[in-house]
């Protein structure tokens, strides 16, 4: 048969299939723009500013609407009330994880980030319990973070106040913390394997947030047949997983069931004793994916947030001066910051919260999926339908945070200058899929940033007003722009 005829037949089949899927899926889904065959609503979505794009759709269709990514319908929740109602009030129904083809390719339904159903529930219970046993929320973990903060200060002092790209140095600190929890290792900041690990984690995150990767997620049939950066992602992920499998093998050979050293040991002990959590997957493959998830989540999210924080603090020198004044008054220069200090440092605490609110690192979180046929606000959402939560619409809500596009710690201070909590503070998402490492991440951000500002003045290479905050990519996550700066030791 003529190749051209074959091509036409294939395209015709895809067109008919797309039309059928779109028509059969609409049912009583929330309203939304009419999708085109094959591409759905992609022609209407600005991937460079999807937050504003979703806001514009919400003005037309309301806080709950449907968009088609290719032939796949995705229900979008916009605004605090809709997201709270779904993730909190209907938490069980919205607790599924959306099918993201590129992620599914590397996780194969294992780990904690992209597993489903009973396996995910059991894995989450195991992870939370084990992190608690290892000192999450206690002095045990705080001591690790404080120790790592001092190693970070030593490394920053080695720059001698000269211009440097902080990406790798800043990334080393949170990566060392999670590595010490997972497999009891902290690395020298020049260790080759350590730098390779961080470099590949950084590169994977950038690729996942690139426009090209979004196309492959929308048209997954292209993944196995087209060249692109996603192949580099798969290669990097294979290296990371192989490296961590090596750590697991070392643990198996030296395991003492009466004296667990770290996260891997706790897993291996339950695996060996066969009296663990019901529905838990105790295969080595599951452990390797779970550990990979923890290393990714505990490294790049913190690193990106801290780099954005450095840019903001250099750009807004009056805010930095207030934070450093509070540090001098409460902590001084001769002891390490601790979490108890946070209760006496409302402005610094507000600054850390405002960094996370302002940068809006994960604009739409990770896609959810309804676990059963669900009635939601008079709409019918069939089991398996994907759900996107616009966290931007909550973090930048102008009623809760007046002038949300302005970086202002006052968003988290009351009239008396005391720190005030906000239910709209959702950088870690909400509900049953909320980040398991939230408390650790909050601790690290406070201690690392406070320790940096206690020891250094931050000097940009350009005029503060010219500092560009525009992310390199803004997809799955926002990637900070490349920049150089100077860390000037405080005398």
UniProtKB/Swiss-Prot annotation:
Residues 1-25 form the signal peptide. It is a peripheral membrane protein. Its cofactor is heme. It is found in: Endoplasmic reticulum membrane; Microsome membrane. Keywords: Endoplasmic reticulum, Heme, Iron, Lipid metabolism, Membrane, Metal-binding, Microsome, Monooxygenase, Oxidoreductase, Signal. Pathway: Lipid metabolism; arachidonate metabolism. PROSITE patterns: CYTOCHROME_P450. GO terms for biological process: arachidonate metabolic process. Its EC number is 1.14.14.-. Liver, brain, kidney, and intestine, with trace amounts in lung and heart. Expressed throughout the intestinal tract, with higher expression levels in jejunum, cecum and colon. GO terms for molecular function: arachidonate 14,15-epoxygenase activity; heme binding; iron ion binding. It catalyses: (5Z,8Z,11Z,14Z)-eicosatetraenoate + reduced [NADPH--hemoprotein reductase] + O2 = 16(R)-hydroxy-(5Z,8Z,11Z,14Z)-eicosatetraenoate + oxidized [NADPH--hemoprotein reductase] + H2O + H(+); (5Z,8Z,11Z,14Z)-eicosatetraenoate + reduced [NADPH--hemoprotein reductase] + O2 = 16(S)-hydroxy-(5Z,8Z,11Z,14Z)-eicosatetraenoate + oxidized [NADPH--hemoprotein reductase] + H2O + H(+); (5Z,8Z,11Z,14Z)-eicosatetraenoate + reduced [NADPH--hemoprotein reductase] + O2 = (14R,15S)-epoxy-(5Z,8Z,11Z)-eicosatrienoate + oxidized [NADPH--hemoprotein reductase] + H2O + H(+); (5Z,8Z,11Z,14Z)-eicosatetraenoate + reduced [NADPH--hemoprotein reductase] + O2 = (14S,15R)-epoxy-(5Z,8Z,11Z)-eicosatrienoate + oxidized [NADPH--hemoprotein reductase] + H2O + H(+). It comes from the Eukaryota. GO terms for cellular component: endoplasmic reticulum membrane. Heme binds at residue 435. The keyword Cell cycle does not apply. Its main location: endoplasmic reticulum. Belongs to the cytochrome P450 family. A cytochrome P450 monooxygenase that may play a major role in the metabolism of arachidonic acid in the intestinal tract. Exhibits regioselective hydroxylase and epoxidase activity toward arachidonic acid, producing 16(R)-hydroxyeicosatetraenoic acid (HETE) and (14R,15S)-epoxyeicosatrienoic acid (EpETrE) as major products. Mechanistically, uses molecular oxygen inserting one oxygen atom into a substrate, and reducing the second into a water molecule, with two electrons provided by NADPH via cytochrome P450 reductase (CPR; NADPH-ferrihemoprotein reductase). This is Cytochrome P450 2C40. It comes from Mus musculus (Mouse). The lineage of its organism: Eukaryota, Metazoa, Chordata, Craniata, Vertebrata.
